[in-house]
A protein has these predicted regions:
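Extended amphipathic alpha-helical regions
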Residues: 1-304
């Protein structure tokens, strides 16, 4: 179900009934992200992919670029020709360098977001997090020379993360419509703390972290003969949600709300620390029992 089922809504009440579909769609992205990371984990870290000095590639300005940057741009160029990035839910990493689609533009029935796509974009942070933080914990050390396969997995994973995080704009719009007066006042006051607190639902975030852990535990099982283990550390997935996806999504929501009201957003360093997901998501034994979290949680919690 695409989020643009929402563009068919004719009234505010209908919008909020369809918002349930947005919630379900966001949940479905969890599988996409987990499977993409599982695919990347089968290869070594292959740091040569991310080093602009290794493959001697140049960007449009003649400066060195990494193999990842080169392949990502070329992939987006191809996808742009078939109008992938005309969809408001898609955010290219290299928007300025993409060609015009060769297919006729699609007509979306109704505009949901009230800011342009380029107004809120955190893809640079998505790439930085992925390369500097995720790969280090996701993959085994070393270089297996599978650079092509690895970088294709990288692109799939980063695009999935980007899509999930930028859905924060749609979430922010729905929350704004529920209480436009309060959000408008907080934005005009520059009260970012109050905005972040209003956007945050700690119990929902706890459920997100637990659900991500359980899905990673289920989909990432690696059972060979008498040996049982995981293709990917389930707690890594929970950590990615807590430390990257949740705070970057809130960052997107905050920026969107400021642009929505017509006020320049503050720099993220003034509020980003408040956006992190909860640290106590795995402290409630009853909640874990209901989710049927495997016993490995006892050891995995040490990574928090």
């Amino acid at each position: 179900m695409s989020i643009f089922a929402f563009s068919l809504c004719k009234s505010l009440s209908l919008f909020f009934s369809l918002f349930t579909l947005l919630f379900l769609y966001i949940i479905s992205t969890e599988e996409t992200i987990i499977f993409a990371l599982i695919e990347r984990s089968q290869y070594r870290k292959n740091y040569a992919i991310y080093d602009p000095k290794v493959h001697k590639l140049r960007n449009v300005y003649g400066a060195p670029q990494s193999f990842l940057e080169y392949m990502l741009l070329e992939t987006e160029k191809l996808h742009s020709k078939v109008r992938r990035y005309t969809s408001p839910e898609e955010h290219p990493f290299y928007a300025s360098y993409l060609p015009t689609p060769i297919l006729p533009e699609l007509s979306y029935p109704q505009q949901i977001l009230l800011t342009g796509k380029s107004a809120v974009d955190v893809n640079s942070e998505v790439m930085r997090w992925y390369v500097e933080k995720i790969i280090d914990r996701l993959c085994k050390a070393g270089d297996d020379e599978q650079h092509g396969s690895s970088v294709l997995c990288d692109i799939a994973a980063m695009q999935a993360l980007s899509r999930r995080i930028h859905y924060g704009k749609f979430v922010a719009e729905s929350k704004f419509l529920k209480d436009p007066h309060t959000y408008t006042e907080y934005v005009k006051q520059g009260n970012v703390t109050a905005i972040v607190d209003l956007l945050t639902n700690v119990e929902v975030e706890r459920r997100v972290l637990r659900r991500a852990f359980v899905k990673a535990s289920t989909y990432g099982q690696d059972i060979t003969g008498t040996t049982e283990g995981y293709k990917i550390d389930p707690m890594l997935i929970a950590d990615i949600y807590r430390d990257m996806i949740i705070p970057l999504t809130k960052d997107v929501e905050v920026r969107y709300l400021f642009h929505r009201v017509g006020v320049a957003p503050p720099t993220p360093d003034t509020y980003y620390s408040r956006c992190r997901g909860p640290l106590d998501a795995f402290d409630d034994p009853k909640a874990l029992e209901e989710l049927q979290v495997p016993p490995v949680i006892a050891n995995a919690k040490k990574n928090l």
